């Protein structure tokens, strides 16, 4: 971990208190559905959506429903609340990736919100032959594990230290998965330090910035569009997100 990553601090109390805007972002998502219907349609490949800390498939239902309307075979993670890597959780996710891939005969895409994004990255490292792409939403994979306002909740829920990495689950969190990877982040995230949610740009990895809360990222209209856009790319023909035209007014330059 770099010196910069080690010194990252959690978001300010002001940003944390502003997380209440997530409910308004859900309203904006519902209101934007007619416009979101213009998002690219997919090719029907399986998409597994993984929830954040202490959240369940209920939290990802709006995004999964939207992606289903775009033509994808969407699945939740089917394990109730995400309480961290408790006994059996890792094996259940691996089994589900195998099931979705074997049933469809295709590689699957992984979309993970917050802690779910960490799982998505590690699963892709373990099973690159079954994973087509990875998209993370506000997932703190690159910074100090305690540069969040949720690390104590994680330790209580999981029974594990926040800085404890399991080498048997994909190795280093900050290492980029060997598949096309998009990290969606927000500088106004009130839970995770945004700097720790950014990927190292490369020929197959990128960052997409949105203006969103952390708790509303899974149902923010700009996030939903970006996820649909990324998933719609033909397999083997990945290209970075296009911010030209109207998109430049919605998606800030992540490198600024």
Regions found by a protein language model. Give the residues of each.
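Amphipathic alpha-helical segments
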Residues: 62-63, 227
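Short amphipathic alpha-helical segments enriched in hydrophobics
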Residues: 27-30, 57, 231, 235
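Serine-dependent carboxylesterase/thioesterase catalytic core
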Residues: 45-51, 56-58, 62, 68-179
């Amino acid at each position: 971990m770099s010196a910069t990553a080690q010194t990252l601090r959690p978001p300010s109390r002001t940003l944390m208190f502003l997380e209440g805007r997530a409910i308004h972002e859900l309203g904006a998502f519902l209101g934007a559905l007619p416009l979101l219907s213009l998002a690219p349609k997919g090719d029907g490949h399986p998409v597994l959506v993984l929830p954040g800390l202490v959240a369940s498939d209920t939290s990802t239902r709006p995004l999964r429903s939207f992606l289903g309307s775009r033509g994808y075979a969407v699945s939740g993670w089917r394990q109730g609340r995400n309480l961290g890597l408790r006994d059996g959780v890792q094996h259940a996710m691996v089994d589900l990736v195998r099931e979705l891939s074997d049933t469809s005969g295709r590689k699957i895409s992984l979309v993970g919100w917050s802690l779910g994004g960490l799982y998505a990255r590690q699963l892709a490292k373990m099973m690159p032959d079954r994973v087509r792409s990875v998209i993370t939403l506000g997932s703190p994979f690159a910074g100090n594990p305690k540069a969040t306002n949720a690390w104590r909740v994680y330790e209580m829920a999981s029974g594990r230290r926040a800085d404890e990495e399991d080498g048997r689950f994909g190795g280093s969190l900050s290492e980029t998965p060997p598949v096309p990877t998009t990290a969606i982040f927000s500088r106004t995230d009130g839970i995770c330090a945004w700097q720790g949610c950014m990927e190292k740009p490369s020929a197959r990895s990128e960052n997409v910035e949105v203006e969103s809360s952390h708790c509303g990222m899974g149902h923010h209209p700009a996030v939903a569009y970006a996820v649909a856009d990324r998933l719609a790319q033909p397999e083997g023909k990945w290209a970075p997100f296009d911010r030209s035209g109207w998109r430049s007014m919605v998606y800030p330059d992540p490198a600024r």
